[in-house]
Amino acid sequence: MVLAAIPSPSRGVVHLGPVPLRAYALMIIIGVFVAVFVTGRRLRARGMDPMVASEVAYWAVPFGIVGARVYHVVSTPAAYFGRDGNVLDVIKIWNGGLGIWGAIAGGAFGAWLATRRYGISLALFGDAAAPGIILAQAIGRWGNWFNQELYGKASTLPWAVRIDEKHQIIPGVSTYQPTFLYECLWNLVVAGILLVVDRRHRLGRGKLFCLYVALYTFGRLWIEMLRIDTANQILGLRVNIWTSIVVCLGALLALAVTRSPVDPNLSREEQEALGIARSRPAARSTVTTAGTADQRAAAPDSAGPDSAALDSVGPDSVDPDLGGPDPADPGSAGSVPAAAVPDASGSTATTATTATTATTATTATTATTATTATTGVPAGSQQSRGLATRLPASGGHTSAVPPEEPQLP
């Protein structure tokens, strides 16, 4: 005697004028919207565009539905290709019959196409989408309740589901284990675990999605053992049970492969999106030229127009790729000391000996000085990198007389 039971809906279709609205399809649609909403919020929290969730859903949902239907038809061929089956029922998806494994495989393929198209990491997106996906599955399971299908063994528990006579597998037995309710509750627990783990622990890329697969398949394993609907078996076990075992082991193996808390292959942008690394502030580009102030202080005011042109070029105009003076180069502006030159009175005058302030009579030297004044790069640095011709030095002074050209024999 059953004292209490969960009643089943009297019908699973609501007509909005001439348009039939099936509760099974409505549950799927609501689940998709919830998944997109949750995924979008998680992407925004990672510094990514929340609209990426919608863009990927445009690809993942159709592929997921097709994959789910294909898996169901392949795993239960007698209902469509058997003696009492009808091949045309294959396309009647509104009557129910979607395999979750096909949905995951097809949806993953569609998501892969979308992420590849938009240049997004599939593993990174999967981690963000995992809690939303499992919530969508929890909502979608109520479609089985509206269709009065995929329930468990006969039961007299107070939370057993009551099935109408035309949908009963065992004639005369009206109450069964509500496997749809069990899976819904299990999925909600998994969603909570994923959110807590993701908040308290920084897993490597793709690991949160693997954890979702492992937890879901573990729950699906014991739920499948309660079902009594017709299904193909291998070694006395339903095909879905074997699938759950294989997929669960594969997910656990994927979790164990990478032991480091952070995937070393993560780019800086992905680390910042995951919250592993903080965004670096934009650093001001400041180039310090050694010896610039000293040289300007030591150079006489009568150094000539070339010196004035150089003084008009500030240190900010120095090419950061070429850098400052080269300490190893004796012709560098920052490394050449001032030379002591005796004057007519016997005193010693300090004369700057940098190549850029010397007055030369040759065209090549003048061109080099003009280039230095234009680009703001010291001549010594240009010489050390082969960008300018090194000027000959005599006794620490720059000679104003060009060297004699060798006579050809």
Curated annotation (Swiss-Prot):
<feature type="region of interest" description="Disordered">
    <location>
        <begin position="273"/>
        <end position="409"/>
    </location>
</feature>
<dbReference type="GO" id="GO:0005886">
    <property type="term" value="C:plasma membrane"/>
</dbReference>
<keyword id="KW-0472">Membrane</keyword>
<feature type="binding site">
    <location>
        <position position="141"/>
    </location>
    <ligand>
        <name>a 1,2-diacyl-sn-glycero-3-phospho-(1'-sn-glycerol)</name>
    </ligand>
</feature>
<feature type="transmembrane region" description="Helical">
    <location>
        <begin position="119"/>
        <end position="139"/>
    </location>
</feature>
<dbReference type="GO" id="GO:0008961">
    <property type="term" value="F:phosphatidylglycerol-prolipoprotein diacylglyceryl transferase activity"/>
</dbReference>
<dbReference type="GO" id="GO:0042158">
    <property type="term" value="P:lipoprotein biosynthetic process"/>
</dbReference>
<comment type="function">
    <text>Catalyzes the transfer of the diacylglyceryl group from phosphatidylglycerol to the sulfhydryl group of the N-terminal cysteine of a prolipoprotein, the first step in the formation of mature lipoproteins.</text>
</comment>
<keyword id="KW-1003">Cell membrane</keyword>
<comment type="similarity">
    <text>Belongs to the Lgt family.</text>
</comment>
<protein>
    <recommendedName>
        <fullName>Phosphatidylglycerol--prolipoprotein diacylglyceryl transferase</fullName>
        <ecNumber>2.5.1.145</ecNumber>
    </recommendedName>
</protein>
<feature type="transmembrane region" description="Helical">
    <location>
        <begin position="18"/>
        <end position="38"/>
    </location>
</feature>
<keyword id="KW-0812">Transmembrane</keyword>
<feature type="transmembrane region" description="Helical">
    <location>
        <begin position="234"/>
        <end position="254"/>
    </location>
</feature>
<feature type="transmembrane region" description="Helical">
    <location>
        <begin position="48"/>
        <end position="68"/>
    </location>
</feature>
<keyword id="KW-1133">Transmembrane helix</keyword>
<dbReference type="Pfam" id="PF01790">
    <property type="entry name" value="LGT"/>
</dbReference>
<feature type="compositionally biased region" description="Low complexity">
    <location>
        <begin position="320"/>
        <end position="335"/>
    </location>
</feature>
<keyword id="KW-0808">Transferase</keyword>
<feature type="compositionally biased region" description="Low complexity">
    <location>
        <begin position="297"/>
        <end position="309"/>
    </location>
</feature>
<feature type="compositionally biased region" description="Low complexity">
    <location>
        <begin position="348"/>
        <end position="375"/>
    </location>
</feature>
<comment type="pathway">
    <text>Protein modification; lipoprotein biosynthesis (diacylglyceryl transfer).</text>
</comment>
<feature type="transmembrane region" description="Helical">
    <location>
        <begin position="177"/>
        <end position="197"/>
    </location>
</feature>
<dbReference type="InterPro" id="IPR001640">
    <property type="entry name" value="Lgt"/>
</dbReference>
<feature type="transmembrane region" description="Helical">
    <location>
        <begin position="93"/>
        <end position="113"/>
    </location>
</feature>
